[in-house]
């Protein structure tokens, strides 16, 4: 689901416009197991995480791309873990201070997962448009 307007507040209490989502896993799992599941699902070579491997998580918030600005929003929404990318040092500190489990899975990895779907959607809607997708990880190989 989308965040509610009551949840879309930054750490100073100001309203923000979060584009992330929040949902619930079918059953709780350990942070360590969930981290491995994210790594496999997004085909991550590596990722960074904050949290105890044996802590149970079930409510997951996510924002593809650089979503570090929404750590507090995920926390207010009741997420056990927040999946995003490009988390900066002070954002990671905030997550740790809040006790928020955090997975930084990489910018490309968190956005690339939708490319095949969007490509098909655009081809269906716009027959005269050429659509290309790239599987190359930009910048850092």
Question: Which residues does each PLM region occupy?
Answer:
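Hydrophobic structural segments
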Residues: 1-141
